[in-house]
Structure formats: C-alpha cells, structure tokens
Regions:
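Short amphipathic alpha-helical segments at helix-loop
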Residues: 14, 52-55, 92, 216, ...
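Histidine-acidic metal/acid-base catalytic patches
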Residues: 23, 27-31, 37-38, 69-72, ...
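Structural motif corresponding to the early beta-alpha repeats
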Residues: 1-65, 162, 190-200
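Catalytic cores of phosphodiester-bond-cleaving enzymes
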Residues: 65-97
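A broad structural signal for short, well-ordered beta-strand segments within beta-sheet-rich domains
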Residues: 1-2, 85, 155
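A generic structural signal for ordered alpha-helices
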Residues: 11, 41, 85, 89-92, ...
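Active-site-proximal beta-alpha loop/turn segments in soluble metabolic enzymes
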Residues: 46-59, 87-100, 130-131
Length: 249
C-alpha cells in the first residue's frame, strides 16, 4: 500500500497571491496519486515549513478561509470525488516549523472549513503525537479534539512519533500511548504510522537549530533500522493489547 505525502514550498497556502502556485503544486501530486492508484494522500499544506508569521484573530480566520479555498479547488480540479483517492489527510506541525496551524484545535478549524468548502467530508486531520506533545495543548485537550474529529468523520492517520527528539519512541513521555488509546476508543482508527528521524540528518539541520532536543542521539547503540523495527513492534503490541482489552475489535 502506497501513501503519498506532499509538501509545498516557494508559495504560501495562506497567501491569496500564491493561490494558483499552491493549487498547481498540489494538483501535480494528486495527479501522481491517481496515476498509481493511491487511496490515501497526505500533506502539510496548511502553510509553508518554517516560513511566515503567526496569524491571529481576524488574520487567522482569513488564513482558515484561504487554505479551505485552496484545498476545495484542488478537490474539484483534480476530480477527486470520482477518483481512487478516498481521503486527504492534513498534518499540522509544531510551533517553529509552522507559525499558525500549530495545534490540533487550530488545524481542525481549517479541515472543517475545507470540508464545508468542498461540499464533501473528504479531508481528515492527521494527528502526530510528537506535534501534539510540542503544542500548547495538554493531553486531555488533544483527546477531546480527537473525539470531535471522530464524531465529524474527520479522524485521519495517526503518527506514533516522539515529541521534541523525534527519535526513539521511548522518549515520548507518554504522549503516544495516551493519544493512540484515544484514537482506538473512537472506534474509527484506520491507519497508524511509526515515524522516526535521524538526529544527524543534514536535511533537518534547521530543526536542530530550532530545538537542540532534535539533535539528541536516542538510539542507545542501535541502528536507525533497528529503532524503526523496535517502534513498529512496540506499536503493534499496543494495538494487539487494545484488542485483548476489548478496546479494538
């Protein structure tokens, strides 16, 4: 199963002047998804990575409206309603990586507007435990958003990833377990990914400059392949034990 993940660069989804550029970028990725029969697509197309300024108040509402317009255009122009693509999962990022859509609650407002603008319950919110843990919302507040997403048919892919370090899942300080459990209890959990970043990846130097915690070696003597395998085993055991406890069927 292939999942396509898209990013935007060189143009801002919240800037009306960049609308056509952003739509063209996303439509190009969606064309590839349709060509190869991809059923689930994802993107971080709320805003550009590590660019721009925080939008608050009326400016935030305008940003919500603009990203909704952009994604509704893509939905129509790429003819997603009659395609193999079954859902589009939007991922928010922590403060610093994003400036505006930096929590599950803020991102949910945008996803809700996307569905309203497209006239279809097509867009979902991807919830990454790492970005939730690095946001300004606590665990109960994120659990409440997860339930609201589920109630509205907008619960997307779950990323099992450790906050701040983005390394070994054992450094998550309880966020993965709590939010994965909240997902499972909705009865609408469908996709879970394990995500681990290399603490010396040259492409992620900007993250290490943003937060030195991202540069910590959490491997404990393992290769990164071994860390990913350990993460998959850990999450699999959690899911299997949700079944044993009657939380999942």
């Amino acid at each position: 199963i292939v999942h396509l993940i898209m990013m935007v660069g060189g143009a801002s989804p919240i800037n009306p002047e960049d609308e056509d550029k952003v739509v063209d970028m996303l439509n190009s990725g969606l064309a590839s998804a349709k060509q190869y029969g991809v059923e689930q697509v994802s993107s971080t197309s709320f805003e550009e990575w590590m660019q721009g300024e925080p939008q608050e108040g009326d400016a935030f509402e305008a940003a919500v409206a603009q990203v909704a317009k952009v994604h509704a255009r893509c939905y129509r122009e790429s003819e997603l309603a009659d395609s193999c693509v079954q859902g589009w999962h939007l991922e928010f990022l922590r403060s610093g990586e994003f400036q505006t859509f930096t929590s599950s609650a803020k991102a949910w407002q945008a996803v809700k507007a996307m569905n309203e603008a497209s006239g279809a319950n097509f867009f979902k919110l991807m919830v990454d435990a790492a970005h939730c843990g690095d946001s300004d919302l606590d665990i109960p507040e994120n659990e409440a958003v997860i339930q609201e997403l589920s109630d509205n048919g907008a619960l997307g892919i779950f990323h099992a990833s450790a906050k701040t370090t983005r390394g070994c899942l054992s450094t998550d300080d309880g966020w993965i377990g709590a939010l994965l459990s909240a997902y499972a209890r909705t009865g609408n959990m469908k996709h879970v990914f394990v995500e681990i970043f290399h603490h010396e990846d040259p492409a992620l130097e900007a993250l290490r400059e943003l937060d030195s915690g991202h540069g910590i070696d959490t491997s404990d003597g393992r290769t990164y392949s071994e860390m990913v395998i350990d993460g998959v085993v850990d999450v699999t055991r959690r899911l299997n034990n949700f079944v044993s406890r009657g939380i999942l069927s």
